[in-house]
């Protein structure tokens, strides 16, 4: 018998911690891809419906899971922010990391494991401090310190390992839909266009939910429910967003409405594509975005997964 999906009532902290600990910044998603493929191979026997797994050179490091007769896709990006080793002891950003001097960075090059310290000069250029020089191009990420209380989870890379976690939890009971694990979101995107074209041509899918993490702000609070974004730098089609709000309200799922002028997501790539996709960002809010101290309320994680389960049935 398939196991009952626990996502609506509990947090699988072990899985979320494992996801956060995987070093896979933008451009280096292969480690996350390999983890997900092993996880899917092991767990799919417990899912209510078996998906078709689609991977290969034409999708680069992305993964598609197709369930039944899909109408809606979930996009969850696998990558994180980080740094790339430049020359001497210089670092250049991957995406927009926001870490203080003294932050521990980890990685691996041809000489072995790395655990170095982040430093900045007076012009805020980033450098590493280590006992030897590092290979050019080596990716470095925050050392993960996963902290959990009865109310909160705090860790580097909840953006977007929590979005990936959410997609995996929805997969446990999903009957009809597509889950797309995408690449490069933190560094400008680049994979969503061909993923969207594939599912549009293959299955006529043209609705998308963006399983990602947004910000706690003056209008979005911890513990008040999953965020439905009315807009960020991009503007989704209002009719589609209102349909999502209506479903959340009818089902009495706690939610918040977000209005921002900055920030973007995989939804921005969908909006700029030539395909007639409707999309909406639906995700839990976090404090301390892109720092080693990202913090999310557990109730918001639960409401996020609960809303996704309902939306994938009713959209």
Locations of regions flagged by a protein language model:
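N-terminal hydrophobic/helix-forming segments and targeting peptides
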Residues: 1-315
């Amino acid at each position: 018998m398939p196991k009952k999906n626990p996502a609506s009532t509990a947090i699988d902290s072990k899985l979320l911690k494992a996801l956060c600990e995987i070093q896979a910044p933008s451009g280096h998603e292969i480690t996350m891809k390999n983890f997900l493929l092993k996880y899917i191979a092991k767990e799919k026997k417990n899912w209510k419906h078996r998906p078709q797994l689609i991977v290969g050179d034409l999708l680069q490091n992305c993964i598609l899971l197709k369930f039944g007769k899909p109408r809606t896709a979930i996009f969850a990006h696998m990558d994180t922010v980080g740094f790339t080793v430049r020359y001497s002891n210089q670092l250049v950003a991957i995406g927009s990391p926001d870490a203080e001097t003294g932050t521990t960075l980890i990685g691996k090059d041809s000489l072995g494991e790395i655990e170095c310290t982040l430093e900045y000069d007076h012009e805020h250029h980033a450098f590493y401090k280590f006992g030897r020089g590092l290979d050019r191009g080596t990716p470095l990420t925050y050392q993960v310190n996963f902290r959990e209380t009865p109310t909160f989870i705090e860790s580097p890379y909840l953006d977007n390992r929590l979005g990936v976690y959410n997609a995996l939890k929805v997969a446990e009971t999903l009957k009809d839909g597509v889950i797309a694990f995408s690449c490069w979101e933190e560094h400008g995107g680049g994979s969503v266009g061909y993923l969207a074209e594939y599912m549009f041509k293959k299955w006529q899918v043209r609705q998308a939910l963006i399983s990602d993490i947004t910000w706690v702000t003056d209008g979005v609070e911890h513990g008040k429910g999953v965020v439905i974004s009315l807009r960020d730098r991009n503007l989704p089609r209002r009719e589609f967003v209102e349909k999502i709000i209506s479903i959340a309200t009818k089902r009495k799922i706690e939610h918040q409405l977000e209005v921002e002028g900055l920030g973007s997501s995989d939804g921005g790539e969908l909006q700029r594509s030539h395909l007639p996709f409707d999309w909406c960002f639906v995700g839990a809010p976090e404090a301390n975005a892109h720092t080693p101290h990202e913090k999310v309320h557990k109730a918001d994680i639960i409401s996020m997964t609960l809303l996704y389960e309902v939306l994938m049935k009713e959209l």
